[in-house]
Amino acid sequence: MNGTRRAFLGTALGVAAAAGVGTIPAAATESGPSRPIPPSGIGMHLYTMRTPLATDFRGTLERLAEIGYATVGVSGRHGNSAADIRRMLDETRLKAVLEHVAYDIVKGAGLPQALEDIHTLGGKWIVVPSLPGSLHSPAGYREAAREFNKAGLAARESGLKLLYHNHGTDHQVVNGVSLYDILLAETDPELVGFELDLYWAANGGAAAPGELFVRHPRRFPALHVKDMAPNGSFADVGSGVLDFPAMFDTARRGGVKQWLVEHDSPADPFASALASYTYLSRLRY
């Protein structure tokens, strides 16, 4: 670690401690919850870091590794090939677990190349980040479920698994039907899983994530751990109002393997990354 980065980490840790960020949650007392998140399961979804990645991809990965992150979810390559990113990941001792790939690619002729690229990255999941607005109806989500099953079969044949990442509108009830429930009910659990974004699930009025884990076991191998400020905006993990210990209590039943930090608009991406990592690494549930 060079002097500049050592100074950054030392200063940021001091700020986090002074603000109470990253301290052990009150619920995790000596007589309370004791389960930690495995260090290998704490990752960063790279959309959070898109601004520094655009100018210094490798340096950004290096700083994430120095903070303590073990894994990343790829979202935007910033002009790099999958092989380029894999080389930088190997050099910084980070592991990519997934990549976000647009719906039109996943259901089209670009799927084989996308699957090959995820193998190159070293990942295990291909993730559809959102659905087009034109599908925002029960009929549209049923169409998407059919496409997911087809793409999920191709993914399984290549040794990967297809996941879907939610936003708030996915949890809306249209004509008396929850759109997200359509995807859960009409996709094959052997072929399709879900990357549950905790902020958007809460923002969209979904059932508590812990309830989803119980109702749909082993369908949620990855999470986007994103916090909500009291005014509803985004917040560093641990600084907002979401009750992560309660959400994680049934995470094992949900099949959660990766807790990927995300903040859609951090004022300082590295300070946000540090504060969020510190909180998750100390969390007990």
Indicate where each model-derived feature is located.
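C-terminal segment of N-terminal export signals and the immediately downstream linker at the start
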Residues: 23-54, 62-63
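N-terminal secretory signal peptides and thylakoid transit peptides that target proteins
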Residues: 1-16
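Acidic (Asp/Glu)-rich catalytic clusters
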Residues: 33-38, 61-66, 80-96, 110-123, ...
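Acidic/histidine-rich catalytic cores of soluble enzymes
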Residues: 157-245
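Hydrophobic faces of well-ordered beta-strands that scaffold small-molecule active sites
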Residues: 40-45, 72-74, 96-101, 126-128, ...
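Acidic-and-aromatic substrate-binding clefts and catalytic sites of carbohydrate-active enzymes
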Residues: 50-54, 73-83, 102-110, 133-139, ...
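Conserved, mostly hydrophobic/aromatic
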Residues: 44, 64, 72, 89, ...
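Active-site acidic/histidine proton-transfer and metal-coordination neighborhood
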Residues: 78, 104-193
